[in-house]
């Protein structure tokens, strides 16, 4: 295990970024260079939500598609990239990221990338390396849960082939499919098979590890909209705070065997409720000032 260079062997990252979001692009590039990660920027401008008239004909089942236009644009952008990657590359894996992830938790990992790959169950299709779940975040390896959504992922080539088979028909995209997962078939405008939050992680054997969180300071879509401001404040900020709390103060309480497994009563103690961490100070200043009594507040609340 090489804790001096934890990301040795980490695959090339393909990250999606709109041309006008230089703030997000610069944020990601600075992190990649800091951690010596090979990367490729994928422009999301080919399928802009504001220019849907140029590409909506590519959705084979457009008459039945009810999700928000930016969600469709994002879905097609990812599928378009995967088609190209699958055709032009022979790599066994591919790593995908959006442009708002916070990689600084790597500094707190107690293992390296080789250990992660070595510990993955042999039947995996997808490794979800970061996720938000308001019902509770499991800080250990586990199969994907119903309310998990898209995050930084490592995909096997065979799984990419399956995704393309399910959602690509010639030059068009089939985005309306039957979904039995109640977390993803209730809200017609934001949930369903036609969002990357579902089809990229819920259509195969996905295992999850809480390794990477979000930078909650960025809005999404083509600008920092008020809708995304509300979403970020109520979702991503809580998740980010919870991730930082675990990696800064809780990870040493559990062994690697416990972190890379699931299914015991011990693992129930490794679930944290994001709503408890609304006021958590990830800078460490409050902990430095109040010591263990500061942590006791979150452990007991």
Where are the language model's segments positioned?
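An acidic/histidine-cluster motif and surrounding catalytic segment
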Residues: 1-97, 101-301
